[in-house]
């Protein structure tokens, strides 16, 4: 076989002698590849780095691309087994023929090329490549540099986005735009029998704009038509594009009947978008939702509006507004807005979003705007806070307005000191509840002594509060409306740290032994006249026993003369410093009775010591971890509260969680007893099929509080999931918990769209450690299939 012939052609205006044309063409090679819109190194970073010897090869940090100079014309190269023709006019090439000009390449069994018109006619196993797009078919007729022409029965691939397909004919408009007649498109990498594809009478593709348009398009999945439209637009890379999103359909319900929604997405700008979703609710009418999202360097937010005119069931207009905004004014100043409002009490139950199934039906809506300032030791908050409360929830107090100032300074000659000042005007929508103003000032100072094996921190603080009430509880005669409290608190926090090297289960550890004492003294002050604006009883656990006040909020300061004793031991990996296990035991000892109570009708506590608190956390190999906590009443020999949890996660999408929660009923606190088992998991059944589930079972009532079971299947270019969820749905007329069931589903056509009515959201909320299925792999680089 004769060797292939390299036959360079140069533009006719070039007067270089014939024997110099090869050299001229070779010198033009660096200009063949056009510039691309990607980040390029510059300066010294882009220079090749030499090895030690001057004769060594050099490492280039990037693929260097040289754009064609403006006004310059790239050389044309022809490669074939046999060539003949007239120089500077035309050329016939046969046998593995190739023509290259700029970044365009044409390959075929035979090519006829006319240099004057730059027209190439290719026959037999034709491949046309330009700008990362490849077409193949039996014949093609096009201008090489302009990439203008047509091709019959082509197959195509967009290398940059991964899209493929075929058609009866393609009209090439330029290097980015093309029109296909009676064709198909898919994002699947397989060239035959793709799982999903779009079939249309005509396709308009624009790789520069990342957009495809199908006329009379029908979306097929596994050979079954899912959706059809006379005008169907879609992104070629899966990025955001304006257009219709997949419709969603909800099965019949007694509340709303059938529901059908068809969202339209407006990609306004890279940092702004708008989604308008009309819902057809068979029993109520047309319900419209609009969500506007915006993001900038100094602000971001989401605004959602919902409107149902003339509800055919409720016989009134119904609406909802949800607005979240964050603002950075610079120099430490900021601001925010949270405004949420619904038209009526039944709105969240009848027209609420799918998030209510995860978090329960929302009955309290925050309406708040504030300004903030943070700079060094200073922190300032000014806000106006109001609440819309729906029955049966109890309305919280709003701060209308509030000004809070904090100052904190650390290690000034060994001292830590600071103060918090707060003014709040409390208002509430519930009748016969006290309202008024409260001014609070809380300075403190502490001095810490720290060493390698000890710490000793005395602290003094003062709580001052002044009230000016406009109304009192029930309007009791003689109850004061103006009064002031001043309550000091002294505390001492000290502890030691011992450590030793031990060997357990064949492994070396550093074991610590950490005794800790925390003493608090606060004198008694009668605070029964103060309303409960923001105060409640603090929980009793390892996180709360080292705080001076047994209440949270500023309306009650507990009198105290108590000592908290705790002992902690840790087992630490000496090489990595990772804590593998921790065990804690703690108890409080009361030297006097605590007389301050949350409500005046409550009896003071007279116990000499608290319940015993025990906690443990263990991390073993292969992803196993455990967290346990117990509250035990030694006097009554009763378990008051317990929480036991185990987690096992040996790898990605492999997690099993088992937990148990128990809380004994306490008549003095009117708490609900808890005796529940919780289990959740995500685990692969096969290489592609995953099971996901959650169960919260109440042992006392022998019922499922909430449950979720589902499956997810991950294929190469699509994914499918289905689940059934049982969830709490408020209380019935007898005061018992209602439960409802719903079916969840998800279909992901990778590279095109996703349809999901809440499946992934439910999996995330229900299974700790849940990992979603992976997205479609990134498309290959345009250099991967270089022709």
Swiss-Prot record:
Identification of the protein by name: LPS-assembly protein LptD
Predominant localisation class: membrane
Pfam families tied to this protein: LptD
Location relative to the cell: Cell outer membrane
Organism: Burkholderia mallei (strain ATCC 23344)
Keywords: Cell outer membrane, Membrane, Signal
Signal peptide from the UniProt entry: 1-39
Similarity annotation: Belongs to the LptD family.
Quaternary context: Component of the lipopolysaccharide transport and assembly complex. Interacts with LptE and LptA.
GO biological process, one term: Gram-negative-bacterium-type cell outer membrane assembly
Function: Together with LptE, is involved in the assembly of lipopolysaccharide (LPS) at the surface of the outer membrane.
Single GO cellular component term: transporter complex
């Amino acid at each position: 076989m004769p060797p292939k012939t390299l036959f360079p052609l140069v533009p006719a205006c070039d007067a270089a002698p014939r024997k110099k044309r090869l050299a001229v063409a070779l010198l033009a090679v660096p200009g063949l590849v056009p510039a691309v819109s990607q980040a390029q190194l510059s300066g010294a970073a882009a220079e090749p780095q030499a090895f030690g010897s001057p004769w060594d090869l050099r490492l280039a940090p990037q693929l260097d691309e040289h754009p064609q100079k403006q006004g310059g014309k790239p050389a044309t190269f022809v490669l074939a087994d046999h060539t003949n023709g007239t120089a500077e006019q035309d050329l016939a090439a046969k046998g593995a023929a190739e023509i290259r000009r700029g970044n365009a390449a044409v390959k075929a069994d035979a090519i006829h090329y006319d240099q004057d018109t730059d027209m190439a006619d290719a026959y037999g196993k034709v491949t046309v490549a330009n700008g990362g797009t490849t077409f193949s078919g039996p014949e093609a007729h096009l201008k090489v540099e302009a990439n203008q022409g047509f091709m019959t029965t082509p197959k195509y691939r967009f290398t940059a986005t991964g899209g493929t397909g075929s058609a009866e004919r393609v009209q090439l408009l330029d290097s980015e735009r093309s029109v296909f007649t009676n064709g198909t498109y898919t994002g699947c990498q397989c060239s035959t029998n793709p799982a999903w594809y779009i079939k249309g009478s005509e396709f308009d593709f624009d790789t520069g704009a990342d957009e495809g348009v199908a006329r009379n398009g029908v979306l097929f999945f596994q050979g079954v038509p899912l959706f059809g439209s006379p005008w169907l637009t879609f992104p070629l890379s899966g990025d955001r594009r304006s257009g219709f999103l997949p419709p969603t359909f909800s099965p019949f319900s007694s509340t709303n009947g059938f529901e059908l929604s068809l969202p339209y997405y407006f990609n306004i700008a890279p940092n702004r978008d708008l989604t308008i979703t009309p819902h057809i609710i068979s029993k109520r009418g047309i319900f419209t939702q609009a969500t506007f999202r915006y993001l900038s360097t100094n602000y971001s937010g989401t605004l959602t509006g919902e409107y149902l005119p003339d509800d055919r069931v409720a016989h009134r207009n119904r609406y909802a507004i949800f607005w979240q905004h964050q603002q950075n004014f610079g120099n430490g100043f900021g601001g925010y807005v949270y405004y949420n409002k619904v038209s009526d009490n039944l709105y969240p139950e009848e027209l609420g979003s799918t998030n209510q199934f995860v978090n329960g039906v929302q009955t309290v809506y925050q309406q708040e705007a504030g300004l903030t300032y943070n700079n060094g030791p200073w922190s300032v908050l000014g806000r106006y806070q109001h609440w819309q409360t729906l029955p049966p929830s109890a309305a919280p107090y709003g701060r209308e307005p509030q000004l809070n100032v904090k100052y904190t300074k650390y290690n000034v000659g060994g001292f830590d000191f600071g103060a918090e000042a707060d003014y709040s005007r409390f208002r509430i929508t519930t009748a016969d509840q006290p309202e008024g103003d409260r001014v609070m000032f809380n300075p403190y100072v502490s001095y810490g002594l720290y060493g390698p094996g000890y710490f000793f921190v005395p602290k003094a603080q003062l709580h001052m509060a002044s009230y000016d009430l406009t109304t009192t509880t029930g309007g009791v005669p003689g109850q004061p409306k103006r009064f002031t409290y001043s309550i000091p608190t002294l505390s001492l926090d000290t502890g030691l740290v011992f450590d030793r090297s031990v060997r357990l289960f064949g492994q070396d550890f550093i074991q610590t032994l950490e005794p800790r004492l925390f003493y608090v003294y606060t004198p008694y002050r009668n605070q029964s006249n103060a309303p409960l604006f923001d105060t409640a009883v603090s929980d009793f656990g390892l996180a709360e026993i080292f705080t001076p006040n047994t209440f949270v909020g500023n309306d009650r300061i507990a009198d105290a003369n108590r000592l908290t004793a705790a002992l902690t031991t840790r087992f630490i990996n000496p090489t990595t410093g990772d804590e593998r296990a921790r065990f804690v035991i703690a108890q409080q000892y009361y030297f006097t009775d605590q007389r301050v109570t949350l409500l005046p009708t409550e009896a003071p506590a007279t116990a000499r010591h608290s319940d015993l608190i025990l906690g443990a956390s263990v991390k073993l190999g292969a992803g196993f971890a455990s967290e346990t906590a117990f509250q035990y009443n030694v006097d009554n020999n009763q378990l008051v509260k317990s929480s036991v949890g185990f987690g096992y996660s040996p790898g990605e999408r492999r997690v099993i969680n088992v937990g148990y929660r128990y809380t004994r009923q306490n008549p003095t606190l009117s708490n609900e007893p808890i005796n529940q088992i919780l289990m959740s998991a995500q685990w692969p059944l096969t290489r592609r099929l995953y099971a996901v589930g959650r169960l919260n079972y109440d042992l006392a009532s022998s019922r499922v509080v909430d449950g979720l079971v589902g499956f997810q299947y991950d294929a190469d270019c699509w994914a499918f999931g289905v689940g059934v969820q049982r969830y709490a749905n408020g209380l019935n007329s007898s005061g018992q918990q209602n439960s409802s069931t719903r079916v969840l589903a998800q279909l992901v056509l990778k590279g095109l769209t996703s349809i999901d009515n809440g499946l992934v959201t439910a999996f995330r909320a229900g299974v700790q450690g849940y990992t979603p299925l992976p997205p479609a792999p990134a498309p290959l680089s345009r250099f991967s299939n270089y022709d």
